[in-house]
A protein has these predicted regions:
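Exposed acidic/polar residues on beta-strands and adjacent loops within beta-sheet cores, strongest
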Residues: 1-149
Length: 149
């Protein structure tokens, strides 16, 4: 199963593409692949992991339906804005309140909130996630926050 849609990831006007696929076969062997490509086809961000770790019950007869729902949800909601980031808090307070950890400096975090830009968020396991932005100067994606329970 594979889906793609146009998104802006590098900046608010970039013409990029978000591609999400789950390989065929039983859940315990299927691979989840998330890729964001530029309009020229360059990989801006990629994530590859066993799909099994992203679902609660992988030993269910309706796994195909669950996989479709997973892909549909991520393809429609995966790219958001750094404007949605909560205000900066000290690490312990942030983790307590948001079940997450800020992975960039306070200065960078507050700049991302003050000047919103596209941000890709996706699960990293059943109850975990990460959010990344593209740093055009560095030419790579940067993890802003990670979280999970």
């Amino acid at each position: 199963m594979q889906k793609a849609r146009d998104v802006s990831f590098r900046n608010a006007t970039a013409e990029d593409v978000l591609e999400i696929s789950i390989g065929t076969g039983p859940c315990e062997r299927a691979t989840l692949t998330i890729v964001v490509r530029s309009d020229l086809g360059h990989i801006l961000y990629s994530y590859v992991a066993p799909f099994k770790q992203h679902v609660a019950d992988w030993d269910v007869p309706e796994l195909d339906k669950e996989a479709r729902q997973f892909v549909d949800g991520l393809i429609s909601q995966g790219v958001e804005s750094t404007a949605s980031l909560p205000p900066w808090e000290e690490p312990d307070a942030y983790e307590e309140k948001h079940a997450g950890r800020i992975e960039v400096s306070r200065e960078v975090y507050e700049k991302l909130r003050a000047k919103p830009r596209p941000m890709m968020s996706h699960p990293t396991y059943h109850e975990g996630w990460k959010s990344v932005v593209y740093d055009e100067r560095a030419g790579e994606a940067v993890v802003v926050v990670t979280g999970g329970v």
